[in-house]
């Protein structure tokens, strides 16, 4: 995969339902890999997914999906994308293998190929032993897995997953996230996950697009989003040392403990100058430095900063 290739390019997209604006002059780039579409409920995430699939016609703006125009390539776009919707989508009376095979046929696969592939994706999703059961007898976790299986049946270039861990218990959630991570990192399938759950996004995604009230508020790698302005350093000490803090402050550095043995340090100037200041203060105070790394905020802190800006 090339992480600099845009799979989806959205330009100044606006979607209105009557007087309500669901997407407001929205622009973003979705690159190869696994991207999280992050925002609170009602932010416009599902509207964006439906627009990408051609289920909703934008009020204004445009873009392309997998090189196809958003307005003129709807059918081709849907053939290249797999959708795992938030709501259940199974057909009553069908077995799991029958339902997934039918989804393959709807995507244009020959019946025999769709049936063979249905067995494969159900096995991959952990439903091999239950594939002949009617889907309505499935638990919530199993229904989530079959939604993923039907989205994968036709070998799409891009998977759209809408709240894929919705309703799952902790074990089921971990297993679903493991599946998604394997699909993205080992199977080479591009994934766009819509979620309001920050831990899910951080667990499996490389990049994130943050949406609030229909507007783009931030996009980039998770590492970029977590980066702290000014790039302070976290110094890990063997034990707490007040003299170390005093020495740093005497040299003009900003220094504050974040845990009992960790000090966050910010020094004006180059990174080399900052390291020299830290090492000199450690020597003067007798502090034992176990490690130094770039300080990061949590994804939750980064998200709250973005949406409150």
Residue ranges and their predicted role:
Residues 8, 22-23, 78:
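Conserved structural motif at the start of ABC-family nucleotide-binding domains
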Residues 61-72, 76-77:
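Conserved ABC transporter NBD signature motif
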Residues 40-44:
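Walker A (P-loop) phosphate-binding loop of ABC-type ATPase nucleotide-binding domains
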Residues 101, 105, 112-130:
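Conserved ABC ATPase "signature" region
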Residues 155:
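Conserved catalytic motifs of ABC-family nucleotide-binding domains
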Residues 159-163:
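Catalytic Walker B motif of ABC-type/P-loop ATPase nucleotide-binding domains
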Residues 177-268:
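ABC transporter nucleotide-binding domain
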């Amino acid at each position: 995969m090339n992480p600099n290739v845009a799979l989806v390019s959205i330009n100044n997209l606006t979607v209105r339902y009557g007087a309500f604006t669901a997407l407001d002059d929205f622009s973003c780039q979705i690159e190869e890999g696994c991207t999280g579409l992050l925002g609170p409920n009602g932010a416009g995430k599902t509207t964006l997914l439906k627009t990408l699939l051609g289920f909703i016609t934008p009020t204004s703006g445009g873009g392309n999906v997998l090189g196809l125009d958003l307005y003129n390539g709807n059918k081709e776009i849907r053939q290249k994308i797999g959708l795992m919707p938030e709501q259940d989508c199974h057909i009553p009376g069908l077995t799991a293998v029958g339902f997934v095979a039918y989804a393959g046929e709807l995507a244009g696969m020959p019946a025999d190929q769709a049936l063979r592939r249905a067995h494969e994706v159900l096995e991959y999703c952990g439903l091999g032993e239950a594939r002949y059961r009617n889907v309505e007898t499935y638990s919530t976790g199993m229904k989530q897995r079959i939604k993923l299986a039907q989205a994968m049946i036709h070998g799409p270039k891009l998977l759209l997953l809408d709240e894929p861990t919705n309703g799952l218990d902790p074990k089921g959630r971990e297993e679903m996230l493991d599946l998604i991570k394997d699909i993205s990192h080992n199977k080479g399938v591009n994934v766009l996950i819509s979620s309001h759950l920050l831990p899910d996004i951080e667990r499996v995604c490389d990049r994130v697009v943050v949406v609030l009230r229909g507007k783009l508020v931030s996009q980039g790698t998770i590492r970029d989003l977590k980066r702290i302005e000014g790039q302070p350093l976290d110094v890990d000490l063997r034990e707490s040392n007040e003299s170390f803090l005093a020495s740093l402050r005497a040299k003009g550095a900003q220094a504050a403990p974040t845990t009992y043995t960790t000090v966050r340090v910010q020094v004006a100037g180059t990174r080399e100058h900052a390291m020299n200041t830290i090492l000199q203060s450690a020597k003067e105070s007798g502090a034992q430095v176990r490690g130094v790394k770039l300080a990061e905020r949590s994804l939750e802190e980064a998200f709250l900063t973005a949406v409150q800006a």
